[in-house]
Amino acid sequence: MTTVQLQKTNQPSIKASRGSYWITTFGCQMNKADSERMSGILEYMGYYPAEEELKADLVLYNTCTIRDSAEQKVYSYLGRQAIRKRSLPNLKIVVAGCLAQQEGESLLRRVPEIDLLMGPQHCNRLESLLNQVDSGQQVLATEEQFILEDITTPRRDSSICGWVNIIYGCNERCTYCVVPSVRGKEQSRTPEAIKSEVEDLAKSGYKEITLLGQNIDAYGRDFQSQNKEDSAQVTLSYLLKYIHDIEGIERIRFATSHPRYFTKELIDTCSELPKVCEHFHIPFQSGSNKILKNMGRGYTIESYKNIINYIKAKIPKAAISGDAIVAFPGESETDYEQTLSLIDEIKFDHVNTAAYSPRPNTPAATWPRQLNEDIKVKRLREINSLVENIAKERNQRYKNTSQEILIENINPKDSFQLMGRTRTNRLTFFPRSLKNGVENKLGELIKVKITDVRPFSLTAKLL
């Protein structure tokens, strides 16, 4: 969960002040990017960032429904705002994102104080929806929509690294996942629109971009179904080449990939383009072919390993991360051990792990052989221990080496340190100090020497 509390823009709003706003974001990078865009819309409308959540005139929760724990947090936050609204009737409460799409009218019945409830496909319509609220309506916007190309400038949380959505929605039907039902069908943005946004970021001084999509390597395939001219050529590989030479952008990343669409052509392209960073996040979810089939993932462990082996052959220094779910319905001890074996064999730099959480309206939630909480806790603890040990082992290769770091921020826990990431996405901390009488600035690319390693971060000194 992240909170968007941004500095006030230097550019005056086009419209008169309408009060303060606060956005709290739950969940994935797509939600973070959506929140930045909604912040831009609110400031265009005349809102300004609040200093505190409980003092805001408009509160927006951009929600996640991938796990039950995320939902419960939202309900807790909404309860607090509902109490506020009873004494502050002009307070506006907005719920956006995947939980809003999933629950719809039932959420309005549960929390009638909500003024606007809208799914992810409606983020770019925030202004018109709030205008309906201002006319006295309680607004529900969850119908499937074509996502408008928004010309409003996002109010970005960083002035160095920018998110760029390139494909919305998901056409997969994983049996545990609600994303297709809440984010809709795949919809790729045109290469021209994406390039224009990246060029604007470069002009504003951004050094790194991360291209985003639920299944980013499926980019462009919906163009083919629409019979657009030259649509077969529009792929993620094509897009990377198309935007690569934009002046000012030093690094390009992308997430999240689906193994089914991760091609040798894409790997070859990444190896040829110097701005594309050597980090690949490719979720595997399980090391058992039986479980992968039950999950509806559409690939085997053997095909997944082929992808990883090809990456390692073409880009030997690449870092590889993934996602894993343990305690999926029917997962035997053997299935679970196969997941541990896969992690140990591939030696992932990092794995995001989770115990299976039944989600409403998904096939797996109704299946027999649901595993109990004790097994979930045990397996999650064990896999996390393995992931941490391997991550520290993998990080040893950086010790005493020189690495390029993009300075992103001051360490929030130590104001005497700066922080940034290597090209392989290793978070790195190093001291603030003068070089030729001048302190390094945020947004600079510098060389450091790695002096110490931890499982999920590095410590360095300036060269």
From Swiss-Prot:
BP-aspect Gene Ontology terms: tRNA methylthiolation
Q: What is its EC number?
A: 2.8.4.3
Could you tell me the superkingdom of the organism this chain comes from?
Bacteria
- Ranges for domain Radical SAM core come to 156-393
Q: Which Gene Ontology molecular function entries are recorded, alphabetically?
A: 4 iron, 4 sulfur cluster binding; metal ion binding; methylthiotransferase activity
Indicate which residues the UniProt annotation says bind [4Fe-4S] cluster 2.
170, 174, 177
Q: How is its cofactor bound, per UniProt?
A: Binds 2 [4Fe-4S] clusters. One cluster is coordinated with 3 cysteines and an exchangeable S-adenosyl-L-methionine.
| PROSITE patterns from the UniProt entry | MTTASE_N, MTTASE_RADICAL, RADICAL_SAM, TRAM
Q: Kindly list the positions annotated as binding [4Fe-4S] cluster 1.
A: 28, 64, 98
UniProtKB keywords: 4Fe-4S, Cytoplasm, Iron, Iron-sulfur, Metal-binding, S-adenosyl-L-methionine, Transferase, tRNA processing
Q: Which reaction does it catalyse?
A: N(6)-dimethylallyladenosine(37) in tRNA + (sulfur carrier)-SH + AH2 + 2 S-adenosyl-L-methionine = 2-methylsulfanyl-N(6)-dimethylallyladenosine(37) in tRNA + (sulfur carrier)-H + 5'-deoxyadenosine + L-methionine + A + S-adenosyl-L-homocysteine + 2 H(+)
Is this entry keyworded Metal-binding? yes
Q: Which residues form the TRAM domain?
A: 396-463
Q: Which residues form the MTTase N-terminal domain?
A: 19-135
Subcellular localization is given as:
Cytoplasm
Q: Which GO terms describe its cellular component?
A: cytoplasm
Q: List the cofactors.
A: [4Fe-4S] cluster
Q: Function, please?
A: Catalyzes the methylthiolation of N6-(dimethylallyl)adenosine (i(6)A), leading to the formation of 2-methylthio-N6-(dimethylallyl)adenosine (ms(2)i(6)A) at position 37 in tRNAs that read codons beginning with uridine.
Q: Which family does it belong to?
A: Belongs to the methylthiotransferase family. MiaB subfamily.
Assembly state and interactors? Monomer.
HAMAP family associated with the record: tRNA_metthiotr_MiaB
Q: What is this protein called?
A: tRNA-2-methylthio-N(6)-dimethylallyladenosine synthase
Say which species the protein is native to: Prochlorococcus marinus (strain NATL2A)
